[in-house]
Amino acid sequence: MAIERTLSIVKPDAVAKNVIGKIYDRFESNGLKIVAAKMKHLSRREAEGFYAVHKERPFFNDLVEFMISGPVMVQVLEGENAVLKNRELMGATDPKKADAGTIRADFAESIDANAVHGSDSLENAAIEIAYFFSATEVCPR
């Protein structure tokens, strides 16, 4: 099995609900290690840059507004098949369609306020990790 890294963000809605620890427990209980983490309040520029791939999509402005509405918790997860494992733990983007027991089914309110972000591929994980963390901020365990 391949040890991978993926980027995860606990979004403003979940931070406001004080469920960061519960979400971290899901990661760690399922074999993912947190190898870097920081809480930050994204600037508009940071949010627009991070989600630039969606710039032409109709939801882009609402997504940016939501992501700058409060602090987020950004972390790098490491483990076997980390990208896929994290996506399975998160559940479907729309919490109404997410399987019971997934992070979004348990903690998200809507397709917009959906508690967490996770990289969708190894390639994007590398780009997203580098967006928020320097190599010296990631601590292999």
Swiss-Prot record:
Compartments (UniProt record): Cytoplasm
Catalytic activity: a 2'-deoxyribonucleoside 5'-diphosphate + ATP = a 2'-deoxyribonucleoside 5'-triphosphate + ADP; a ribonucleoside 5'-diphosphate + ATP = a ribonucleoside 5'-triphosphate + ADP
Key words of the record: ATP-binding, Cytoplasm, Kinase, Magnesium, Metal-binding, Nucleotide metabolism, Nucleotide-binding, Phosphoprotein, Transferase
Enzyme's top EC category: transferase
EC number: 2.7.4.6
GO MF: ATP binding; metal ion binding; nucleoside diphosphate kinase activity
Binding site for ATP: 11, 59, 87, 93, 104, 114
Active site: 117 (pros-phosphohistidine intermediate)
GO CC annotations on file: cytoplasm
Domain of life (superkingdom): Bacteria
PROSITE patterns (alphabetical): NDPK, NDPK_LIKE
SMART domains: NDK
GO biological process, one term: GTP biosynthetic process
Gene3D superfamilies, per the entry: Nucleoside diphosphate kinase-like domain
Cofactor: Mg(2+)
Subunit structure: Homotetramer.
Family note: Belongs to the NDK family.
Name of the protein described by the UniProt record: Nucleoside diphosphate kinase
Source lineage: Bacteria, Pseudomonadati, Pseudomonadota, Betaproteobacteria, Neisseriales
